[in-house]
Amino acid sequence: MKATLVNRVRSTIDPRDNHPYLNGAWTPMFEEWDAEDLGVEGRLPRDLDGVYLRNTENPVHQPLGKYHPFDGDGMLHAIAFEDGKAGYRNRFVRTAGFLAEQQAGRALWSGLAEMPPRSERPGWGAQGALKDSSSTDVVVHAGRALTSFYQCGALYQLDPRTLEQHGPAQWHGAFPAEGVSAHAKVDAASGELLFFNYSKQAPYMHYGVVDRDGRLVHYRPLPLPG
């Protein structure tokens, strides 16, 4: 196996912090790696060709107040299989919030459990005070891995094999101002992406469809009586 350290991000998390969601299996990592020709127990089928993607919450900075695991910065892990071999790489999702906090060298937004919010800048999502960490979900559509935020935000695009970053999805200028919630689904037969979003202002929810080429073809409000 050959492993290469690609990058190490700047972190301010106090190693003495004993929060259960910052330790043990939840201990964050701050390095980005490429690893080729991973060691294998047994044998990988040579016709196994594809990528396994896993999204995680991986906080970088000491929280502003109470911490919830949903607050962690998005990180993708990828294991690629080809010709009987496997390779690994991981990358932070370069969201607007992640980049702003890297520049500031500290947390700028408080999290889900901190009420009232202590965020120092306007936030994203239905609540409007949180960082869009794009750490909740990942789905592959139109050749791109799309990461998303549980309270509605941008869909950040990455190459599913290399994890090269391509910024927020634009959908040819038609991306909804209300954002997109996590847990969009892809229709395996049509290649369409099916999604929803929600907000505190009427209309409170929308449903939409994006075709296999990344064009928004359907976007309608859903009535929510009461």
Where are these regions (language model features)?
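N-terminal regions that are enriched for targeting/export leaders
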Residues: 1-124, 130
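Well-ordered mid-protein domain cores that form the structural environment of catalytic cofactors
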Residues: 95-218, 223
